[in-house]
Structure formats: structure tokens, C-alpha cells
């Protein structure tokens, strides 16, 4: 079944019941008439272990440029939301990223709860999960507990779930379609409301993952590409697969002209434009 269906159809498929508070928040996040999501992640943190990225050294300035581009939502860590979001409160739906982790398990911490997200006025609660490997049970347990608590506050849970491979004994992200499909199924069975998984690089394979999921699938924006055109082309393929949109971080604020970058991704996600047409439309 396609996950890009209008929300009432998704509710019917999944049993027809959803609390009003959660429905209101999901409708704000997926508020565009396309039914898809173009969101921006501003949550580059210690897990990347590569210092402060130039595009996020001044978070309020970055937010100002991003908001001008009119994304459908912005994802932030709880501390930055408390200190930098007031100026933009109500302008764009806020999603609180709660997790701080590293792929090799050298860090795993929850910085926020669903209640924290509600108190900050957020419309979504994001939580990261790593599957495959000896510690996947621990991540799944944290997600399951968050889903239970989120139900009390009627806030949707957006699970950022990433499969790992251990070729050569070193943990790396896996982009194999079967691993991504497994990750998506894990998230669905844990009861989350939206699943964010990496794009596997193949439209047909990703379309199968989307079709198999009873929950909306959105794509992760992925590592920074060589140029903006490459990132836009990848997201264009995501749209072709039938996914419900994407969340982009480094490929928005990692290049110059941040506001125009957001508009270009919006054109691809909401208007179905090619990378070339989106670049022309936004003057990039």
C-alpha cells in the first residue's frame, strides 16, 4: 500500500482510529497539498564527531535563512530549540530530535522526552534507532518506551532508523535495500507514526520498501553531496518511489544560498520537478 496517501486514507487502512491531538500535529507536518514533507534538519551534533559545520556555527542566522525558504518542518535538538527557536515559534512546525548516538555505540543518550517536545510546542518527536548488530535490542527498547509515552501526549513519533553492516568488523551504515526494508519493518512494528530511512539508490527497490510499509516513509537527506544538483536528483528519485518526502540537513545549509536551497527542494518534493528545473526555478 502506498504511504503517500492522504491522512484519512492512512487512518482507514490502519484501523480508522487516531487521537485528535496526534492527527492535528500530523496534519500540520504534512500540511502541503502534495501530501509530502519537505523538512530541514538542524541537528548536527556530537554524533558526527567532525566539529561545528560552517553552515550551523550561527544557528539563529541559519534558522532565519531556512525559515525564509518555507520548509514544512524543522528538526532540532532540544537545547537549541530552547535557546534559538523563540523568534520562529509558530512560523514552521517544530520536530524535536531526542537522540544523541554514534554508529559504533560509543554514545547513546536520550536528551528529550515526548513531554519535553510538547512543552516546547513541537508537532513531532523524533528518535533515532540503529538496527543490525548486538545492540539493536537496546535501541528498539528505547523507541518502544518513547512510543508508549508519546501516546499519553498525543504527539507523533518520527523514527530515524538506520541499518548497519559490519564488513571488516567496523560498523557502517548499510544502504542495501533488504537492510533498509528490515529497518522500516522494525520501526513499523514498534508503533511509530512516520519512518525516516536512508535512500537505497534504486527507485524500484525503494518503491517496494514504501509499498510494503503500513506507515509513511520519508527519506533521509544523506551525506553531503558534491553539489546541490546531486542532492536534488537523489530526492527527485525519492519522490518517484512514492515516498512521503524527505528530511534534508547538510545538503541545505551546507551550501551557499540556503533560502534558495530550501525552495529548490520544495520544488522537487511538492511539484515533482527535476533537479535541473528546480535549479532554474530558484536561480541557482
Regions found by a protein language model. Name each.
Residues 39, 44-46, 51-74, 80-89, ...:
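Alpha/beta enzyme core
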Residues 220-221, 248:
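Thr-Gly-centered strand-to-loop micro-motif
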Residues 244-253:
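Short acidic/histidine-rich active-site segments
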Residues 239, 254-284:
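C-terminal helical cap(s) of enzyme catalytic domains, especially alpha/beta-barrels
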Residues 10-43, 82-91, 281-282:
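N-terminal amphipathic alpha-helix/helix-capping segment at the start of soluble metabolic enzymes
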Amino acid at each position: 500500500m502506498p504511504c503517500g496517501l492522504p491522512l484519512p486514507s492512512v487512518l482507514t487502512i490502519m484501523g480508522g482510529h487516531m487521537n485528535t491531538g496526534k492527527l492535528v500535529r500530523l496534519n500540520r507536518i504534512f500540511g502541503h497539498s502534495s501530501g509530502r514533507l519537505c523538512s530541514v534538519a538542524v541537528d548536527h551534533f556530537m554524533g558526527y564527531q567532525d566539529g561545528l559545520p560552517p553552515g550551523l556555527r550561527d544557528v539563529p542566522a541559519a534558522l532565519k535563512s531556512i525559515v525564509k525558504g518555507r520548509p514544512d518542518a524543522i528538526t532540532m535538538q532540544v537545547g537549541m530549540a530552547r535557546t534559538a527557536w523563540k523568534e520562529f515559534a509558530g512560523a514552521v512546525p517544530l520536530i524535536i530530535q531526542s537522540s544523541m548516538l554514534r554508529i559504533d555505540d560509543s554514545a547513546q543518550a536520550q536528551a528529550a522526552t515526548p513531554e519535553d517536545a510538547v512543552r516546547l510546542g513541537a508537532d513531532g518527536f523524533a528518535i533515532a534507532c540503529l538496527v543490525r548488530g548486538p545492540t539493536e535490542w537496546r535501541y528498539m527498547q528505547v523507541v518502544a518506551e518513547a512510543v508508549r509515552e508519546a501516546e499519553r501526549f498525543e504527539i507523533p513519533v518520527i523514527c530515524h532508523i538506520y541499518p548497519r553492516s559490519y564488513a571488516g568488523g567496523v560498523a557502517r551504515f548499510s544502504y542495501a535495500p533488504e537492510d533498509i526494508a528490515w529497518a522500516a519493518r522494525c520501526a513499523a512494528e514498534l508503533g511509530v507514526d512516520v519512518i525516516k530511512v536512508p535512500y537505497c539508490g534504486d527507485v524500484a527497490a525503494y518503491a517496494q520498501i514504501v509499498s510494503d510499509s503500513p506507515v509513511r516513509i520519508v527519506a533521509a537527506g544523506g551525506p553531503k553531496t558534491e553539489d546541490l544538483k546531486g542532492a536534488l536528483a537523489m530526492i527527485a528519485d525519492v519522490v518517484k518511489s512514492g515516498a512521503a518526502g524527505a528530511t534534508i540537513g547538510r545538503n541545505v545549509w551546507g551550501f551557499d544560498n540556503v533560502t534558495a536551497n530550501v525552495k529548490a527542494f520544495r520544488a522537487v518534493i511538492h511539484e515533482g520537478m527535476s533537479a535541473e528545473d528546480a535549479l532554474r526555478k530558484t536561480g541557482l
